Amino acid sequence: MTKSELIERIVTQQGQLSAKDVELAIKTMLEQMSQALATGDRIEIRGFGSFSLHYRAPRVGRNPKTGQTVRLDGKFVPHFKPGKELRDRVNE
């Protein structure tokens, strides 16, 4: 599902909300979540899951085209851990 499809579904289910209001709410929520992760905060949405950063250590990779070894720096990557309610609902 894309962001546009999500907006359409919410507008369809919640007839009193306009598409612009829903779009603004979703964009604002995603921006706030991105900013929180960028500053190292953990985001927890009860019943859904949590977002955090995991550190990937520096390593030696390989360019698949040339086979040449490449040094890759360590970096933080976003990580999502689903909550129990979400896991249960998906496995129904």
Swiss-Prot record:
Molecular function terms, GO-annotated: DNA binding; structural constituent of chromatin
This protein's UniProt keywords: DNA recombination, DNA-binding, Transcription, Transcription regulation, Translation regulation
Transmembrane among keywords: no
GO biological process: DNA recombination; regulation of DNA-templated transcription; regulation of translation
Naturally occurring in which organism (per UniProt): Azotobacter vinelandii (strain DJ / ATCC BAA-1303)
Gene expressing this chain: ihfB
Record flagged with keyword Transcription regulation: yes
One term under GO cellular component: cytosol
Protein name, UniProt field: Integration host factor subunit beta
